[in-house]
Amino acid sequence: RGFISGVNSFTLMAIPFFMISGSIMNQGGLSKRIIQFCSSLFSWLRGGVGIVCVAANMIFGAVSGSGTAAVAAIGFITAPDMEKIGYKKEFTGAASTAPIIPPSNVMIIFASITGLSITRMFLAGYTPGLAIGLILMVICHFYAKKHNIDYGGKFHLKAVISSLGECFWALLMPLIIIVGITAGFCTPTEAGAIACVYGLFVGVVCYKELNFAKIKKVLFSAAEGTGQVLSLYAASTVFAYIFTVEGFGVKFQEWLMNVSSGSAIVIELLIAAFVLLIGCFMEPVAVMPVILPLVFPL
């Protein structure tokens, strides 16, 4: 009963919608065109292939909200190219900003647990998400410079305009979500549903790459991703309930107050260290239902 009631939330309805829209981007040819556009913009720079990977991840993350989906869609295409020209394998796997940039599954679950507004969470996430993306681009540039990785060619304005025309409809998809949520036209859940319908229209009518077989793949892929996220979350809520019944939360809060002598900075540092330690072994989706009820009231 606790397993089912843990995911019985309207807020969490946003997750499958964003998963479906991300899967539509992948199967409908939208992600491929976004990579081509980013490539025309950045591939001429030192470290251009890495920068393209980061930029495409940021755009894809603004639709799917899932790091796994972003790696499957973008990393599958860009990672082999990065390795081929000299990037190390471990470096190529570190460019996903999808969990940070809204609509993030992590933010949706955080809001569901704490009762905070998802819209406000998303608005707060855009600036750090963009900042981290820009920092990763700079790192890619200096990494390529240090390891003497070649340039990707010259900048051609015609190629940028041509690729922009190709991916215009694809770029509108994240814009619909961002503008719809930030302007208050729709809730995040409604924005996800609108993105699904729009992506389906673009994939079938505009790019003509979505057929019945691919739509089946979209639904199965989204169901698999959603099932993984929500199963982890549901199991963690049961674990959190046991913690509450046994009074572990009160004991943990008392311990924090005693160790920190009531200092807010020390409490924050202890919580950060605790979350960092647990995050080395567990997914954020599994950590939050256990940790947030303990530390959020503080």
What label would you give each PLM region?
Residues 1-298:
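Alpha-helical transmembrane segments of multi-pass membrane transport proteins
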